[in-house]
Amino acid sequence: MKQFANLHLHSTHSDGVYTPEELVRIAKNEGYRALALTDHDTVSGNDEIRAVCEREGLDYIFGCEFSSPWRERRTNFHIVGFDFDPEYPEMKEYLAQRSFCEAEQTRILFERGLAEGLLHDITWDEVLDYNRGVTWLCNNHVFNTMKAKGLVADLDYMNFFHTVYGKRRGEVKPPYESKPIDKMLRLIRDAGGFAVVAHPHNKLDVIPELIGMGLSGLEVWHHLLTPEERLKALELAKVNNLFISGGSDHDGLCGGYYSSFEHPEESEFYVPECSCGTQEFFFREIKTRTLHSEREAVIEGCIDLEQNANY
């Protein structure tokens, strides 16, 4: 099913491959007509992508992806917050904390890598300088700086990641904790936004509980959901009046991870063009924050299309 809007994207402002401007160009060429940049715990790229979308004639909605634990269930959720005010005091403070945590963890492991001889011929100041304007600094930003200096090539990434970062990230305790799921949902709402659960492929059974905490929607067309899970998600959205979202995340052309493959369909990151995202009808609901009376019939039509495609 060809999608209209791609509402789950990552840029170089978090752990994505492309700049916001590059993302718009690639998404437009692929066929998308509306976008949301949902970088991890940061909104530093949103002004840029909004401006480029306006210039290129694409629709846009403000977004960010947060990670929240649900300790009682011993699991973690990714929550996309849409259309909130990043200047709302508590949200502004939380975004600053999350960026500081990521950058500080990255810096500490970077310094350990230097001390242990795992890294060389690079300084933290060079990482900061190369990634100006980025506040949420992760291992990708270190690697990209090294690549720009000619110290590594793309094929070196996995060895770099597992040697310098990888499981070692657990050795560095963050100075601030992520907000648990109930408090994260409340903060997004208090900041004037609404929340959608990202790629709920193995968490659909707890959606009713999350609705009670303030969840407003869920992703349906995301590569991690099986055909059966997409059908279940559509039914949940219909019965519970939930917004329907979706996006390519780190996969597909916008993910950037199979651009070097001669045959992209051989990559684990491959998805058919414009297959992840959401339909124009559901995007308009999200954009206007209004559920339309004909949505049940539209959802039933999507269910029929999904069933016919799968059987």
Task: Enumerate the predicted regions with their spans.
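An N-terminally biased module of ancient metal coordination in phosphate/nucleic-acid-related enzymes
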Residues: M1-R74, V164-K167, K173-R189, F194-V197, ...
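Generic detector of intrinsically disordered, low-complexity, polar/charged segments
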Residues: H13, Y60, H78, K147, ...
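Generic signature of intrinsically disordered, low-complexity segments enriched in small/polar residues
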Residues: E21, I26, L35, Q97, ...
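Extended substrate/RNA-proximal surfaces in nucleic-acid metabolism proteins
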Residues: E54-P208, K287, G301-A309
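His/Asp/Glu-enriched, well-ordered alpha-helical/loop segment
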Residues: G256-Y311
